[in-house]
Amino acid sequence: KSCCKNTLGRNCYNTCRFMKKPRKTCSGLCGCKIS
């Protein structure tokens, strides 16, 4: 589960994951923390 600061971050993360990128990459890119 990703812990993003806001909806924008969550959308960013989901889009990134949809493009088959690693969780770590997406969380860093979108300012999210992996919990």
Curated annotation (Swiss-Prot):
Q: Which family does it belong to?
A: Belongs to the plant thionin (TC 1.C.44) family. 4 C-C subfamily.
Protein name, entry field: Thionin NsW1
Record lineage? Eukaryota, Viridiplantae, Streptophyta, Embryophyta, Tracheophyta
After translation, the protein is modified as follows:
Contains 4 disulfide bonds.
Q: Which GO terms describe its biological process?
A: defense response to fungus; defense response to Gram-positive bacterium; symbiont-mediated cytolysis of host cell
Q: Please report the organism this UniProt entry assigns to the protein.
A: Nigella sativa (Black cumin)
Print the keywords alphabetically.
Antibiotic, Antimicrobial, Cytolysis, Disulfide bond, Fungicide, Plant defense, Secreted, Toxin
Q: Looking at the keywords, is Disulfide bond present? A: yes
Hey, what's the signal peptide range on this chain? none
Task: Please give one Pfam family short name.
Answer: Thionin
